[in-house]
Structures are given as C-alpha cells and as structure tokens.
UniProtKB/Swiss-Prot annotation:
The lineage of its organism: Bacteria, Pseudomonadati, Verrucomicrobiota, Verrucomicrobiia, Verrucomicrobiales. It is an enzyme of class 2 (transferase). Belongs to the EPSP synthase family. MurA subfamily. Its main location: cytoplasm. UDP-N-acetyl-alpha-D-glucosamine binds at residues 91, 120-124, 309, 331. Cell wall formation. Adds enolpyruvyl to UDP-N-acetylglucosamine. Pfam families: EPSP_synthase. This is UDP-N-acetylglucosamine 1-carboxyvinyltransferase.
Amino acid sequence: MEKLVVHGGFTLRGAVNISGSKNASLPILAASLLTDEPVVVRRVPDVSDTNFMVQIMGQLGASVERSSGNVRVEARNLHSEAAYEQVRKMRASICLMGPLMARMQRCVIPLPGGCVIGDRPVDLHIRAIQALGAQVQIERGNLIIEAPRGLKGATVDLSGDHGPTVLGTDNLMMAAVLAEGTTVIESAASEPEVVDLANFLTKMGANIQGAGTRRIVIEGVEKLRGCNHTVIPDRIEAGTFMVAAAMMGDGVTLRRVCEEHMTVVTDLLRKCGHHVEFNERGDTVTIIAGKTPKCGEIKTAPYPGYPTDMQAQMTALFATTPGISVVKDTIFPQRFMHCSELKRMGADIKVDNGTAVISGVETLSGAPVMASDLRASAALVLAALKAEGTTEIHRLYHIDRGYEMIDEKLLAIGAAVERLPDDDN
C-alpha cells in the first residue's frame, strides 16, 4: 500500500489538464461489448476503476488494448460469466449486465463492490432487466440472469428512494438498444455521463431519444457497429481542483473542462467569494481564492443539482471558511465518514441525520488520517493542502480509484506532496 504525504501551506499556481470522466468511461467501456466490431474509446483515465473494468472485459473474452489514454476493444468471442476476484473491487461492474444480456441473453455477475458509503442496492437494475423479460436469481452471491426468448422493449420507471439511478439508467439503455421493440425509461438520470453514453451508443447505430431528460425512448435495432469516441471531461475531478484553488490558489487554470457541466459548483464558489472565470469556449477555467471567503450551504441532488460526489470536497473548504456552513446529502445521507478525520485535523463539524454543520476555524493542523472512500480521500487531500504542518493520508488506493496522477498534478501547481510506501498498513 501507499500513502500521500502533504506539506501544507503552499500557494497553488499554474495549469492542470483535467482527465476524461471516470464515471462516463466505465459504462462506455462496458457498452463496447455490444458489438463484435472494433471500438476505440479516447481519454479514458488511467485509474484503478478503469483498469479493473478492462481486466474484467478481458476475462469475458474481449480483446482489449490500452495505450496513452486510448482503449481499443474488439469483442468477437464473449462468454457470459464475470469473475468474482475483479468484480468485487468495483461497484460499477454491475453495468456489464446490460451489454451481456443484450448480446448473449445470459450473464452471471457476482454482486459488486466499491466504495462503502451507505446503501447502494442493485434492486433497480434487477427490476429493470426483469421488465425487459429476463429471469433473475441470486445464488451464492451471484446474479444469474437469463432471457431465453430475448429481451423485449417495455416501459420502466427507475425512480428510487434517493432520486434517479445513474448506473441503472446506463444499464437499461445498454440492454434496450438491441431489444425487440420500444423501451421507455421514466425517471431516468440526466447526468452528463448518461448523455455521453447515449452519444456513444448512437455512434454505434442505436436509436435513442431524450438522453439528458427524465424520459428516454429507445427503439431496438438488430446490430450495432464499431466506432471511435472521446470521453467527456471529468466534472468531479475538475470540481475538486476548483475547490483546491479556492482554498490555496492564486491563479490556477484548469484545461479540458466543460463549463456547462460545472454550473452548480461554479455558482457556489462565486457565491462564497471566490473568483472563477471561463474562457469563451468554456473549456478552460481560472480560479483565484477569495480574500474574504464566505460560508455557504449546499444540499445534494440529482443533476443539475449539487453532486453528492462533490460534498466532501466542499466540506473541506468550509472547514476554514469563517462562519457556519451547512452540507446536507439527500442522496447518500451516510456519506460523512471524512468528517471524523477532518476533526482530527482541527475542524469543527457536527454531523446528524445526513447533515453536517461546519463552524469555520482559522487553521487546520497536519495529522495522520485514514481515507474511507474515493471522495472522502479527496477531501482529506484538500484539507491537507490548507493545514499547517504535514499530513499523512493512508489507504491511498481509495483516491487512485478515481483521480489520475493526483500527486503529479498537484506538484505541477506548486503543492508539496509525495507518494510513499505505507509501512503502517
């Protein structure tokens, strides 16, 4: 294992290239199994989650070549059973269900792993595939799914307790593109990553209308073809670096971003007194930390609301912002494990019933802290940049799941960080 050692207090200046979206890459890679023709996906981030997905696809029989951010997939000879050893490491592996069912009418997928941040049930995925005519059994920790007569189009409502499901929408779209007839997805997720998947599927020859709205209509086709596709920028990585710049920046420029996807984070940072300016094309943004930052309030919500994947980072910002800030997570109310570690660094945070109340303190102090999940680890890195002294962040593998070369990118803008072997874990 490795740890990240951060020496706090250094001003951040310079430029960073934002990677392609991890959350878009995973279902797009899975969707490449829908055709036996070659597919090339560009700007796939080199993070452990995409590496796991590539390994699983190879185990399923696909030929997968990876080079300099490009992934070439040719899935001529597939088999339908995914291995537990890789699937257990990544929650998003459930999105293999849709392509395998569409292509082979059968799949066996171990119930997946990933971040442990509260209940993330696969019930909606199961309900959706059953609506298309599949039979589902759970045996010895495996989902065994079969549709001997093929998948048939249907109307499926994906509404859940905490809003639309992104991976559920992805999975159902992928299953429906080769199904017989028309599939209508009600209460669909409208995140940019869902739209990117729909654009990729459309390039392959799928007939999809309404992606980006709450109602998606898919007319099944007989066959999909190969294509080339470039993944959208990672809005969560961009947001994380925007917050880092708001905490310690004196002119940090982020390239390869999408202004349209960053609206809610941009508006919040400006409201809290920080300077955020995009270029005319909306693909480059410069952030300068405000001299008189203000406290704020956020409530997570499905897109275009404030993303749950950005609440931990904003909590780190609020920890040293004067006044009382409030963070409420309506999507994953248990997603506050980072707060206990921030408190070890001197933060004043009270968490109750899915809400964190943060009283800003003047300074944080470096301390040994433990990452508990992907975005929590990002929050700890941000806090460490601001803290006085040295912080050691253990279980660095969490952050490597979703941030490409974060230590190198931070070094490029003036942070004092080093990745070291973790002898304590």
